[in-house]
Amino acid sequence: MLTNPRSDRVRSVHGLGRRPVRERTGRFLVEGPQGVREAVRYAADRVVDLYVTSTAAQRYALDIVQPATAAGLWVHEVSDEVLAAMSDADA
């Protein structure tokens, strides 16, 4: 479980909220269950990592986490604090 909201990985994900970072890396951040569900279902080959809290992992196990795992995606469990730090919201 990722618990350090100041880690390099968390900073990298948070950086995707800025246009220059998205343009440089060619990556973007999808947030919310509907967007993530659709990305896993229809574009799993383009998903790099999936970050979920333990609560979200349980709530969306059947329609997001299990299909992501079956598609060979990296699913990382993170604390609520880490997810907030990754978000584009100023946490």
Residue ranges and their predicted role:
Residues 1-90:
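N-terminal positively charged helical leader segments and presequences
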